[in-house]
């Protein structure tokens, strides 16, 4: 299945709009290029609707938040939904601060996300509307182990159904 997805990306070569973490922006661009797509980065509210309109998808990463980026995320997300473009949310650090948690929850209320990816604590925070994380790492109490793997999978499936999104629990 992954091979088919990559083949489709290489054949279509979509432009992907990224409102992403300044720490990882270069890595994100290079991975998108390596997959056969083209990245474009813009978080300026006066620019994002035009950029989103010419793209095949939108990646929103809340790793470096400020008032301007939040405004840009909302504007781009609304435009992507209007155009039926794929939209992904990476709720980096949701649960670490009230700004991150409230922003992630608000984005989910305002924007239809096709995919939500995050560590287990970030996803639990989105599901409950509050939670804790160890910065950008999952809280130790949330660690997925052999013993609770079935429970974690059931949780991810339930949240996927509730949110209407594909849910990917990744990282530590």
What function would you assign to each model-found segment?
Residues 48-49, 96-97, 124:
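Short secondary-structure capping/turn micro-motifs that flank functional sites
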